[in-house]
Curated annotation (Swiss-Prot):
A molecular-function term among this protein's GO annotations: 1-deoxy-D-xylulose-5-phosphate synthase activity
Protein name: 1-deoxy-D-xylulose-5-phosphate synthase
Signal peptide coordinates: none
GN (gene name): dxs
Cofactor: Mg(2+); thiamine diphosphate
GO CC terms, sorted: cytosol
Pathway(s) it belongs to: Metabolic intermediate biosynthesis; 1-deoxy-D-xylulose 5-phosphate biosynthesis; 1-deoxy-D-xylulose 5-phosphate from D-glyceraldehyde 3-phosphate and pyruvate: step 1/1
Lineage: Bacteria, Pseudomonadati, Pseudomonadota, Gammaproteobacteria, Pseudomonadales
Length: 631
């Protein structure tokens, strides 16, 4: 196996067994003795594929053996296999008839980064956000019972995703309805237990065997007739298992817990899964894997190798670097440290996105004021509300797509009480290859309808810094939404001065047409304005809207064009239209933004072009409307 990034194969490896296992049916025709060799081939294939396309890396390497075992033992796709999040699903895609399409992974018109029902019958549930698998698999298990079907339902969830409340809600409900389903905990961080070895593997085989299950059920029927006897026996079994395995929590929730077992020991996994396949009631299998298994750099640095960019040919000349500024997330991270030094009331909160949201420096400089709440967006927001009640100034650093999961808390716990919570909303707009499940397409729409909410959209790095200061000093809930990637390299002021709330800025004076820009499309708007001599306005604030400026522009121009990287429906442009209607002002309007579709994965530039939000698309749309109006 390769030991460095440069050693990842650039040519498709020779894989005679994998060639015969292109589908689960083909896999099940292989001898069990061949499966470990197949695992080596699949690992090489995954290294090659992701090296060519880029994408999620470490998680897939860690579940090679688990994926093989699941498709070998269960009758997929008739048996329903649900992957949580989907970062680990690349081996699953390779084994389910999509190997020859893997080089289109995450590319325009190619296969998706995550399981998609529309892509394959083996993708039984579409995912992207975490902690949904148990609920989905439970729904499938209940449906199977209602349909008198014997098909199995299996959820595979990581130890990180299991921290979310939704997962425990599903675990609790499953035991209430005594669902026939299997949950597999893919523990690749060893955060629950390190007790893995020969003894626990042996114990798992015993506890999952039909003999043990039959004896257990028979004893339960007998002892249930004696008051208190079954409870004593259950506790005795629980304590005995608890001495060797860490499953007490799941046993208390009513699940039959098996494990932990070595997730890279194929014979043990296959034997255990065969035993558990026909057990009744909710079954829980704890599998310990190593993220990045088989590729030393990823094993050593699983966070750094969570995802990688594609390998370029060794002889390819380096592409000239475009002039660009720092990443927007880096600007936020620097501001957070600067404001924390100036205001000891500031605290930083993130739901498991320390690296992505650029809170690493803050966490190291102010560890007592940094709170990573794990994958618990609802808790993160209400935690911030509680802190704000006591005079703290919380900053919730969160991706736009994940803030959707805490919308009730945002309204009920923060906004209704008018609490001082600043939401630093990263990955707003289109995010590229991860596709619609990770896009931040709706935040302006769902934020601007909340009374008292301050909503800002920066056009560059310096505007972002000023808006963060504005939100921090605002009395009430505030949100700043900014995109993934780098800015236009605007000079950044080192001060912490706020903006005047609700005031836009005219960046270019033209005639007839005014381009009202909400966000980072300002540069494209300026290009277009040069071609048609349009006025360009950096609106800055979605709420409160600069109503005086909008009225002024409506009075001095023949066409107003709103531009935003948000859903057109209910977005910033809609706010302009609603205001003009309320003032009985009739003025031609053109709203440019994200259409009423899920924009499929592609490179960000391709997605913007598809939506008409690049300079060429904006110019074409504006000119077409000018022709209609006779301008």
């Amino acid at each position: 196996m390769p030991t460095t990034f440069q050693e990842i194969p650039r040519e498709r490896p020779v894989t005679p067994l994998l060639d015969r296992a292109d589908t689960p049916a083909g896999l099940r025709r292989l001898a069990e003795a061949d499966l470990e060799t197949l695992a080596d081939e699949l690992r090489q294939e995954l290294l090659y594929t992701v090296g060519q396309t880029g994408g999620h890396f470490g998680a897939g390497l860690g579940v090679i053996e688990l994926t093989i075992a699941l498709h070998y033992v269960f009758d997929t796709p008739d048996d329903r296999l649900v992957w949580d999040v989907g970062h680990q699903a690349y081996p699953h895609k390779i084994l389910t008839g999509r190997r020859n399409r893997m080089l289109s992974l995450r590319q325009k018109d190619g296969i998706a980064a995550f399981p998609r029902r529309s892509e394959s019958e083996y993708d039984t549930f579409g995912v992207g956000h975490s902690s949904t698998s148990i609920s989905a698999a439970l729904g499938m298990a209940i449906a199977a019972r209602l349909q008198n079907s014997a098909r199995k339902s299996i959820a595979v969830i990581g130890d990180g995703a299991l921290t979310a409340g939704m997962a425990f809600e599903a675990l609790n409900h499953a035991q209430e309805v005594n669902a026939d389903m299997l949950v597999i905990l893919n523990d690749n961080d060893m955060s629950i237990s390190r007790n893995v070895g020969g003894l626990s593997n042996y114990l798992a085989k015993i506890l999952s065997s039909r003999t043990y299950a039959s004896m257990r059920e028979g004893s339960k029927k007998v002892l249930s007739r004696l008051p208190g006897a079954w409870e004593i026996a259950r506790r005795t079994e629980e304590y005995a298992k608890g001495m060797l395995v860490p499953g007490t929590l799941f046993e208390e929730l009513g699940w039959n817990y098996i494990g932990p077992i070595d997730g890279h020991d194929l014979p043990t996994m296959i034997a255990t899964l065969r035993n558990m396949r026909d057990l009744k009631g909710p079954q829980f299998l704890h599998v310990v894997t190593k993220k990045g298994k088989g590729f030393a750099p990823a094993e050593i640095d699983p966070i750094g190798y969570h995802a990688i960019t594609k390998l370029e040919p060794a002889d390819k000349p380096a592409a000239p670097k475009k002039a660009s500024g720092p990443k927007y997330s880096a600007v936020f991270g620097q501001w957070l440290c600067d404001m924390a030094a100036a205001d000891n009331r500031l605290v930083g909160i993130t739901p498991a996105m320390k690296e992505g949201s650029d809170l690493v420096d803050f966490s190291e400089r102010y560890p007592e004021r940094y709170f990573d709440v794990a994958i618990a967006e609802q808790h993160a927001v209400t935690l911030a509300a509680g802190m704000a009640c006591e005079g703290s100034k919380p900053v919730v650093a969160i991706y736009s797509t994940f803030l959707q999961r805490a919308y009730d808390q945002l309204i009920h716990d923060v906004a209704v009480q008018n609490l001082d919570v600043l939401f630093a909303i990263d990955r707003a707009g289109l995010v590229g290859e991860d596709g619609p499940t990770h896009a931040g397409s709706y935040d302006l729409s769902y934020l601007r309808c909340i009374p008292g909410m301050l909503v800002m959209t920066p056009s560059d790095e310096n505007e972002l810094r000023k808006m963060l200061s504005t939100g921090h000093l605002y009395n009430g809930p505030a949100a700043v939404r900014y995109p993934r990637g780098t800015g236009p390299n605007a000079p950044i002021s080192g001060d912490l001065q706020p903006l005047e709330i609700g005031k836009g800025v005219v960046r270019r004076q033209g005639e007839k047409v005014a381009l009202l820009v909400f966000g980072v499309q300002l540069a494209e708007a300026m290009q277009v304005a040069e071609q048609i001599n349009a006025t360009v306005v950096d609106m800055r604030f979605v709420k409160p809207l600069d109503e005086a400026l909008v009225l002024e522009l409506a009075g001095s121009h023949e066409l107003l064009v709103t531009i935003e990287e948000n859903a057109i429906m209910g977005g910033a442009g809609a706010a302009v239209g609603e205001f003009l209607a309320s003032q009985a002002v009739l003025k031609p309007l053109l709203h440019l933004g994200l259409p009423d579709i899920y924009v499929e994965h592609a490179k960000p530039a391709q997605m913007l072009a598809e939506c008409g939000l690049d300079a060429a698309g904006i110019e074409a749309s504006v000119k077409a409307r000018m022709v209609k109006l006779g301008l």
